[in-house]
Amino acid sequence: LEIEAVKKVRESYHNLYVMIPFVRTVNEMIETKRLLEAEGLRQSPDFKLWMMAEVPSNVFLIDEFIATGIDGVSIGSNDLTQLILGIDRDNQKLAEKFDERNEAVTRALERIIKACASKGVTVSICGQAPSVYPELTEKLVRWGITSVSVSPDMIDTTRQLIADVEARLSTTPRPRTA
């Protein structure tokens, strides 16, 4: 049903991308691509296939997910944090332990971002983290994130922070390789 809806929209609008949520296994991504292609929805410059990185298996298997030929990855930091830490962010007793800056979470973010950046795959992050923790946003930029989503009240602040970090990165000498 969802694929039929996407096809119908594509008849009139050619700037539609598809983002697949909660992809647990590489085979699920392969099967999803097969189903889309069987319905005539093939990747092209105006039809991109993205996946959400929201579950720990995405972290461990990011290279394999990239190898399926996806065009982009959007990290769902709220769900990924919740599932890595085993904390229900809506549970009042546990909410204070929900923290995207936890080392396990930041290592996961770094792994996904660096893998995507090294293979030329667009990588973004959605969730509250970039709006709440500027120090985390700086790390995301250093690791090679392509874009971040923030709450409307943080757009200007985050834009300036990213510009500052990118300026520092562009003036930092890079090690020479043989």
Predicted features, each with a name:
Residues 1-178:
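Conserved alpha/beta-domain cores
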